[in-house]
């Protein structure tokens, strides 16, 4: 049996990308953002089509993402942040709540969101991961923007076929 298969599309030309970056753990978050923006450019996304906003910390990322998603101006969004374990339970709270919020926004607004909020035990781990994770976020955003547009087109094609079937039935009646 032969099945249809979608091949990942990393062509960013014409895509509009919104980025929300935490300022907490700023050196790491700036490293994430630099790598992400460089990779978006490498993938063909124009600087004019990228909006980067900053928020105080990881817990504020979901609200900013929601506002960007509500605007319907972006094909994909990216969350950038760094939550580094400290001495208290706060690490788990921030990690879990920011991640859940990011996922909820993606599902509620049918908008792809690349989650590059690092959760690490140490500053050194975060620094070691920031460049590759920033690049990865750009690739995920572009790939998922293209995938969702393709899947949306499938839905539109199916609706068009249903409309044609309804018209045929009306003509026969």
From Swiss-Prot:
Which Enzyme Commission number(s) are listed? 2.5.1.78
Residue sites binding (2S)-2-hydroxy-3-oxobutyl phosphate per the record = 87-88, 129
Q: Which CDD domains match?
A: Lumazine_synthase-I
**GO BP term (any one):** riboflavin biosynthetic process
Catalysed transformations (reactions): (2S)-2-hydroxy-3-oxobutyl phosphate + 5-amino-6-(D-ribitylamino)uracil = 6,7-dimethyl-8-(1-D-ribityl)lumazine + phosphate + 2 H2O + H(+)
Q: Would you identify the family this protein belongs to, as annotated? A: Belongs to the DMRL synthase family.
Q: What does this protein do?
A: Catalyzes the formation of 6,7-dimethyl-8-ribityllumazine by condensation of 5-amino-6-(D-ribitylamino)uracil with 3,4-dihydroxy-2-butanone 4-phosphate. This is the penultimate step in the biosynthesis of riboflavin.
| Full protein name | 6,7-dimethyl-8-ribityllumazine synthase
């Amino acid at each position: 049996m032969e099945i249809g298969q979608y091949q990942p599309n990393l062509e960013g030309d014409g895509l509009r990308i919104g980025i929300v970056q935490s300022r907490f753990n700023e050196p790491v978050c700036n490293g994430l953002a630099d790598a992400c923006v460089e990779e978006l450019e490498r993938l063909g996304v124009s600087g004019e089509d990228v909006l980067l906003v900053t928020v105080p910390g990881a817990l504020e990322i979901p609200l900013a993402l929601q506002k960007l998603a509500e605007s319907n101006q972006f094909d994909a969004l990216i969350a950038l942040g760094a939550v580094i374990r400290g001495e208290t339970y706060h690490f788990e709270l921030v990690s879990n709540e920011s991640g859940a919020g990011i996922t909820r926004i993606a599902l509620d607004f049918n908008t792809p969101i690349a989650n590059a909020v690092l959760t690490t035990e140490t500053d050194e781990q975060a620094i070691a991961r920031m460049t590759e994770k920033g690049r990865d976020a750009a690739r995920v955003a572009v790939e998922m923007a293209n995938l969702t547009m393709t899947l949306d087109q499938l839905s539109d094609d199916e609706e068009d076929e249903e409309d044609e079937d309804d018209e045929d039935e009306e003509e026969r009646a």
